[in-house]
């Protein structure tokens, strides 16, 4: 006997019970250890930060990380999965700052670095219990007891070793360059961090500013004669910018050498801009006083909008860093560059070398002046009228100042894409300063070549989003002017300036006169800042630089750092024993600029090879309306809300099947509820149906019931089952759980809506003949196989089916479905022709029901005829062979198959068409057909009464009735049919005995009273 199945199963409670079963039996551990002799399969877990609560997007990534290793284990692989925690960096620091009420780095310095970092250390596992609970609740099997932790000394030391390898190859350098800078956090950011913080539709100024040309430079440029104009009218160059705060640092204007420029007569003055931009700026109607090429403008000089020296800001020469004297005339040049666009602006680009990457490059190339009037907190310095203000606040003041001086041509607003800090959400500024860089551009070709060895899902990511990122790769600004992170392992001599990178603690201890290390090792600031030694070159004091590492460097180093490579002897075999490279990683698509990139870059820089082979890139989660989830929109769904209501399997199944992995997917309680109803409950109802009838008949599973002549319906479902095994195996092997899951959905639909429905009478009949036993065994085989196919997807439901269907029948079986092998298809049982024929019958039946629905004809009402037009004549034989099934499904008396292309007349027919297929039902109803339809309606009402009266499925009853003349004649005419369908021993006209369950009914305007009793 199987355990009785509750048709109204509480899935969340069932899952809690199964979690306990797994824990009691140590199933996860056994699933790994039992496969120790198998080939290794390695998952790299992208480490989350546990100082914040897990969200629904974490559930998405974790269930996709889970499904493939579960499948691989069932295929015989040894697949230990080690978790990880990202414990450094801005995500941690900002939370602690918030707790302490800090608003700047100065607050941290006053508080004390040691105390601040101690708070960071204690905060990183603030929500670890919630992470662990969620991980267990969704059945994400990963070893968190032995998780790697990026703040551990051993992990940090491996990160140092990795950087030393790059240093020794000449790939690490310090440079004064423009880098993305967060004024709130007071630190540089890498390009991949910046890529994660862009916001669309950001509103900013759009100002067009006039720069007055120094007239004496016209003669030098040879334009004085070419452009003859009244000497009393000034001549301006018109430039455009969205960052007015950078205008005080302007030291050049850039033009395109090959493009045409026009001088417009603006009545009171002349103004120069690119000719192709006149129409867009609505200046085409202004008189043109002259034209020239951009190259002709090179050599002109103009007056600065602001003379920085008047406001206490030095002006330096980028060629030699010398300072421009106060008495020296200050004029700035017009230069030609390749980056001037004719698609926006004026064709004249405002250039401020201190605040733009291309601007800085131009400054170096042309030896421009350099003005730095903004501090690291993003505030204007000097004695400007707008000094002390944050740059974005100063925009208005600067624009107002220029307007008052007659230098503002237009002052508008625009919406565009702008970068914000990925952690604190402050607007970034581009800022020239010293930073440490990894020369990733030196290995650009290797990065691109290695990417071609990686299998990306979806495939377009390889040469699209990720490939483009690699093609446009820039050097990695890896240093951060912060506190809680892996210290940059570079020491500089305070005397001679020599620098060197240290690759490990023992190497450091071996340095001459090394001192400062505490008894308890802690490789963090401020302790590591005290570690000094003597310079090999001059004997001076070697002191560590103050920066810490980008936390993306930490997570990107995990392939080696998690094993303390190469310091632990057993770590040196990672490439031989299958721990490197990873077989599989999975995260959201934005990690193409984050973890996916840092992993690939570090591995290429050190080993010149990729460190992962297969990657599933996940799209983002949206709300039910397709909008991004955010607290401000109040549309964030907490995982517990859905898990407590529908269970983890429902959420997992929705994520796998709702959309391909790379697509954005909508998410809501309602959508998960639909999955529960459409798939899990359908499967559960089949399972419940089987157990109910198998227990009634005391069925014991045995393969012998499927030997010899197997009924066609059973042969078909077993054929479909074995084809399903092939398809799911292929899908998961190809890292496509969506396609695999959808095939399972299709099969469960076939099983429920066709096989079980068409086999019901086989289960209902009283005798246990070969046909009935074959049906039981076929359905049992399907359910048991499904439990194993579903194990990687919906581990709880799979376990429930296995525990009840397998272990109850064979106590010696493996104690969990997750310890079993993945099903292997018996290809000898696959009958493609039979599958196609029955699928055609299902298609015709579905279209026929649609045609009936159009004519408002109930399914219980028999019809005279159905006419079918097929796509090809070759399909006719199979359909006619199975004609009886079509007649039964559509409740019609006759089937006619027409020639392909036949047009069925509309009169007296209702039709449904799909492509070349048409199914039409005859809508005319004879008295005999109407009577038969009424009899079927009476059966339906009696079946409902049986349930309401509390009878079991197999109970026989006695039925009494009172009816009008028409219904009485129908009942007498179809009495045998009614008795058989309702398990009525007798069908008696007249009132029933006392205590019988009674109902008074109206059937198409006719009155009927029914009583049912034992």
Curated annotation (Swiss-Prot):
Monomer. ATP binds at residue 631. Belongs to the class-I aminoacyl-tRNA synthetase family. IleS type 2 subfamily. It catalyses: tRNA(Ile) + L-isoleucine + ATP = L-isoleucyl-tRNA(Ile) + AMP + diphosphate. The keyword 4Fe-4S does not apply. Catalyzes the attachment of isoleucine to tRNA(Ile). As IleRS can inadvertently accommodate and process structurally similar amino acids such as valine, to avoid such errors it has two additional distinct tRNA(Ile)-dependent editing activities. One activity is designated as 'pretransfer' editing and involves the hydrolysis of activated Val-AMP. The other activity is designated 'posttransfer' editing and involves deacylation of mischarged Val-tRNA(Ile). The gene is ileS. It is an enzyme of class 6 (ligase). IleRS has two distinct active sites: one for aminoacylation and one for editing. The misactivated valine is translocated from the active site to the editing site, which sterically excludes the correctly activated isoleucine. The single editing site contains two valyl binding pockets, one specific for each substrate (Val-AMP or Val-tRNA(Ile)). One of its GO terms (cellular component) is cytoplasm. A motif ('HIGH' region) lies at residues 48-58. GO terms for molecular function: aminoacyl-tRNA deacylase activity; ATP binding; isoleucine-tRNA ligase activity; tRNA binding; zinc ion binding. It comes from the Bacteria. Its cofactor is Zn(2+). This is Isoleucine--tRNA ligase. The lineage of its organism: Bacteria, Bacillati, Chloroflexota, Dehalococcoidia, Dehalococcoidales. CDD domains: Anticodon_Ia_Ile_ABEc, IleRS_core. Pfam families: Anticodon_1, DUF5915, tRNA-synt_1. Keywords: Aminoacyl-tRNA synthetase, ATP-binding, Cytoplasm, Ligase, Metal-binding, Nucleotide-binding, Protein biosynthesis, Zinc. GO terms for biological process: isoleucyl-tRNA aminoacylation. Its EC number is 6.1.1.5. A motif ('KMSKS' region) lies at residues 628-632. It is found in: Cytoplasm. InterPro entries: aa-tRNA-synth_Ia, Anticodon_Ile_ABEc, Ile-tRNA-ligase, Ile-tRNA-ligase_type2, M/V/L/I-tRNA-synth_anticd-bd, Rossmann-like_a/b/a_fold, tRNAsynth_Ia_anticodon-bd, Val/Leu/Ile-tRNA-synth_edit.
């Amino acid at each position: 006997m199987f355990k009785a199945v509750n048709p109204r199963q509480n899935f969340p409670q069932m899952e809690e019970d199964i979690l306990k079963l797994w824990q009691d039996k140590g199933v996860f551990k056994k699933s790994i250890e039992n496969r120790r002799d198998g080939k290794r399969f390695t998952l790299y877990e992208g480490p989350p930060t546990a100082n914040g609560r897990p969200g629904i997007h974490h559930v998405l990534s974790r269930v996709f990380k889970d499904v493939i290793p579960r499948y691989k284990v069932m295929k015989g692989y040894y697949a230990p999965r080690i978790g990880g925690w990202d414990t450094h960096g801005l995500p941690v620091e900002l939370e602690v700052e918030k707790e302490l009420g800090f608003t700047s780095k100065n607050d941290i310095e006053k508080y004390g670095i040691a105390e601040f970092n101690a708070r960071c250390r204690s905060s990183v596992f603030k929500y670890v219990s919630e992470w662990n609970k969620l991980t267990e609740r969704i059945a994400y099997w990963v070893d968190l007891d032995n998780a790697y932790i990026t703040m551990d000394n051993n992990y940090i030391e491996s990160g140092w070793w990795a950087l030393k390898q790059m240093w020794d190859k000449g790939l690490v350098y310090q440079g004064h360059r423009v880098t993305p800078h967060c004024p709130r956090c007071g630190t540089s950011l890498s390009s991949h961090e910046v890529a994660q913080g862009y916001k669309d539709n950001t509103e900013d100024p759009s100002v067009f500013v006039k720069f007055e040309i120094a007239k004496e430079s016209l003669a030098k440029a040879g334009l004085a004669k070419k452009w003859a104009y009244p000497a009393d009218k000034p001549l301006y160059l018109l430039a455009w910018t969205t960052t007015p705060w950078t205008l005080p640092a302007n030291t050049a204007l850039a033009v395109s050498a090959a493009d045409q420029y026009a001088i417009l007569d603006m009545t009171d003055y002349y103004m120069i801009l690119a000719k192709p931009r006149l129409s867009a700026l609505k200046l085409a109607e202004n008189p043109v006083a002259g034209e020239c090429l951009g190259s002709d403008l090179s050599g002109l000089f103009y007056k600065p909008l602001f003379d920085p020296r008047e406001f206490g800001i030095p002006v330096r020469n980028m060629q030699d860093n010398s300072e421009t004297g106060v008495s020296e005339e200050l004029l700035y040049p017009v230069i030609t560059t390749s980056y001037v666009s004719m698609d926006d602006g004026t064709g004249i680009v405002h250039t401020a070398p201190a605040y733009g990457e291309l601007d800085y490059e131009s400054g170096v190339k042309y030896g421009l002046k350099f003005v730095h009037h903004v501090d690291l907190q993003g505030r204007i310095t000097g004695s400007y009228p707008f000094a002390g203000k944050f740059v974005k606040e100063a925009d208005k003041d600067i624009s107002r100042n220029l307007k008052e001086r007659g230098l503002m041509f237009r002052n508008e607003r625009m919406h565009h894409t702008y970068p914000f800090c990925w952690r604190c959400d402050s607007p970034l500024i581009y800022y020239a300063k010293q930073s440490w860089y990894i020369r990733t551009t030196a290995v650009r070709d290797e990065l691109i070549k290695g990417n071609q060895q990686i299998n990306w899902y979806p495939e377009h990511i390889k040469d699209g989003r990720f490939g483009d990122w690699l093609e446009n790769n820039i050097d990695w600004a890896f240093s951060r002017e912060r506190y809680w992170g892996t210290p940059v392992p570079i020491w500089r001599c305070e005397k001679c300036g020599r620098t060197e990178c240290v690759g490990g603690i023992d190497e450091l201890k071996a340095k001459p006169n090394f001192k400062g290390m505490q008894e308890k090792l802690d490789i963090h600031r401020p302790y590591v800042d005290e570690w000094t030694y003597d310079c090999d070159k001059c004997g001076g004091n070697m002191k560590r630089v103050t920066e810490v590492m980008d936390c993306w460097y930490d997570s990107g180093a995990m392939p080696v750092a998690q094993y303390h490579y190469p310091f632990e002897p057993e770590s040196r075999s990672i490439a031989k024993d299958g721990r490197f490279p990873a077989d599989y990683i999975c995260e959201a698509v934005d990690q193409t600029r984050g973890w996916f990139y840092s992993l690939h870059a570090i591995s290429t820089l050190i080993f010149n090879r990729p460190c992962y082979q297969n990657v599933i890139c996940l799209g983002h989660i949206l709300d039910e309306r397709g909008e991004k989830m955010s607290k401000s929109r109040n549309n964030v769904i907490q995982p517990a809300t859905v898990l407590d209501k529908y269970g983890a399997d429902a959420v997992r199944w929705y994520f796998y099947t709702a959309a391909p992995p790379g697509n954005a997917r909508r998410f809501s309680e309602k959508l998960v509820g639909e999955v529960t109803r459409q798939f899990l409950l359908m499967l559960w109802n089949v399972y419940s149906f089987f157990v109910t009838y198998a227990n009634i008949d005391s069925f014991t599973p045995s393969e012998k019931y499927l030997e010899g002549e197997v009924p066609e319906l059973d042969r078909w479902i077993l054929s479909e089952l074995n084809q399903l095994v092939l398809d799911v195996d292929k899908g998961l092997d190809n890292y496509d759980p969506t396609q695999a899951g959808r095939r399972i959905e299709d099969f469960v639909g076939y099983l429920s809506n066709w096989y079980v429905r068409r086999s019901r009478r086989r289960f209902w009949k009283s005798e246990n003949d070969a046909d009935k036993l074959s049906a039981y065994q076929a359905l049992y085989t399907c359910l048991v196989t499904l439990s194993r196919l579903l194990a990687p997807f919906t581990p709880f439901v799979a376990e429930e089916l296995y525990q009840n269907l397998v272990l109850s029948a064979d106590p010696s079986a493996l104690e969990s479905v997750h310890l079993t092998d993945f099903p292997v298809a018996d290809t000898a049982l696959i009958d493609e022709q039979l599958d196609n024929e029955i699928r055609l019958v299902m298609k015709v039946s579905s279209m026929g029901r649609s045609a009936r629905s159009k004519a408002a004809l109930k399914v219980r009402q028999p019809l005279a005829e159905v006419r079918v037009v097929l796509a090809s004549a070759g399909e006719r034989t199979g359909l006619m062979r199975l004609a009886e099934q079509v007649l039964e499904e559509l409740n019609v008396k006759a089937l006619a198959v027409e020639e392909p292309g036949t047009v069925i007349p509309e009169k007296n027919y209702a039709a449904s068409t799909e492509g070349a297929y048409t199914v039409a039902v005859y809508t005319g109803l004879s008295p005999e057909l109407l009577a038969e339809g009424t009899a079927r309606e009476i059966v339906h009402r009696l079946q409902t009464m049986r349930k309401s009266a509390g009878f079991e499925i197999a109970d026989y009853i006695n039925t009494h009735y009172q009816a009008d003349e028409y219904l009485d004649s129908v009942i007498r005419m179809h009495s045998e049919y009614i008795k058989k369908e309702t398990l009525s021993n007798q069908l008696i006209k007249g009132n029933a005995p006392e205590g019988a369950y009674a109902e008074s009914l109206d059937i198409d305007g006719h009155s009927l009273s029914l009583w049912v009793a034992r």
